[in-house]
Amino acid sequence: MNPLVIKLGGVLLESDDAMKRLFEALVDYQKFYKRHVSVIHGGGRLIDNLMNKLSLPVKKKNGLRITPSEHINIITGALAGTANKTLLAWALKYNINAIGLCLADGGSIDVERLDENLGHVGKAIPGSPLFLKKLFKEGAIPIISSIGITKDGLLMNVNADLAATALATTLQANLILLSDISSILDGKGQRITEIDSIQAEKLIMQGIITNGMIVKVRAALEAARVLRRPVDIASWQNTEKLKLLFNGVNIGTRVYV
């Protein structure tokens, strides 16, 4: 069975209830299945709250956070520090063998600067799977923040959905984009169970898919194209359904090329 990459986002990182549900589902899943699992996360809301406390501006362009050089150390601390180690702490609380990493560790994901106008925002490029495969052999779950490092040693903030796509490509894994959003919704607010690139672009043009969801959907489409398999967008909110999701059942929106 292919490895599984679970991307965490939304309010999950700030909710004890969400953490409890997620890690209970992972523990139960690992009791019955030997599939290798890797977790990757961002922490946009955590960063927004921190920036507001520091009276620093929060600016985005096409759903991507503008990250000037004076902000990258703060964002690195929030993502690779607070967010990553909070997830690691929850894993240890549930006796899960986990290790906290960033994209650069083991050369797992290469990163280049995406756009000078965005500052320290990186483009994730699939790297080497060898380090992560060694961790899998030891029975560990890598928990990876979306902070990367360029070849010339610059810290980069990478959109976590796009980082997850690169990670899934590196591992030839199935990908789940997990957040507080249960699925993509149509113009009437109803769940879309399956969507392809033509349908997605139509909903974007109509203004039904907007803002950060555009990045999420396009990341899922790119992952589906590269991996040649569908990608799931789903919510963490139902523990029982999470177990089904980890085993390949569609509980949200399944994205096809």
Curated annotation (Swiss-Prot):
Name the domain of life.
Bacteria
Metal-binding as a keyword of this entry, yes or no, is no
**An individual GO BP term:** L-arginine biosynthetic process
Which residues bear the site annotation Transition state stabilizer?
K7, K216
Which keywords belong to this entry?
Amino-acid biosynthesis, Arginine biosynthesis, ATP-binding, Cytoplasm, Kinase, Nucleotide-binding, Transferase
Could you tell me the EC number(s) of this protein?
Answer: 2.7.2.8
> NCBIfam families, per this entry?
argB (TIGR00761)
Q: How does it assemble?
A: Homodimer.
Protein known as: Acetylglutamate kinase
Gene this protein is translated from:
argB
